[in-house]
Amino acid sequence: MRKVVLMSLAVFTLLSCATKKEIIYFQDSNSLNNTEIQKAFEPIIEPNDILHISISSFDDSLVAPFNKEKFAENNASSDNLALQGYLVNSEGNINFPVLGAIAVAGKSRSEIENLLRTKLMEYITDVVVDVRILNFKVTILGEVANPGVYTIRNERVTVPEALGLAGDLTDDGNRNNISIIREENGKRIVTKLDLTKSDIFTSNFFFLKQNDVIYVEPSLRGVKKSGFIPDIPALLSLVTVILSAVIIITR
């Protein structure tokens, strides 16, 4: 009987603890030494993006017809973004002053800057064009400290950086099965990433795109805590107590 109790305690201990391999990130990180860093990431413009386009020149009067009215920084709420910027319509175009409809979907920011610069040089020889995405955001759900929607100001964010913004995974987050949900070319794509391995750094999903969704599913321990499946360690603990009582009574 005592052997049964000891075995139950051993199993209880094993099932109650997360293993080191389940918790530590990038466990084969030594393989990253001297590896080439991916080229600078630049997001591709999509329908429903809102672009901030700034046109400047030595002569302010020349660029005035091409610039929208500037809003105060404290008025830059989500409701005012469309007023401050140019909404990319379902056809992938923006309606730009004087120039009319400009096709921007499928282009990078630098490509749009070059396109507008070429067109505007007919009016302004020293024109400078700057394009930014106003509504670049990612959504982080599941087993993280602070789930929510995060606006990315510099339009460049990696999976580890985004999870850092959300306060990192909880202890109950499954680190080897992170879901990235992305809409691309009218289709929804879902991929899985393993944070315990360093090959995440070479994944096409390492850099997040606007409107990406990260979902961190609960680990087995997290599912047990939710009550959807029996808590085996708790059951074993109960059995151990009962067996211990039986031993004491039958002595």
How should each PLM-predicted stretch be described?
Residues 1-17:
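Sec-dependent bacterial lipoprotein signal peptides
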Residues 2, 17-251:
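Ser/Thr/Pro/Gly-biased, low-complexity, turn-/loop-rich segments
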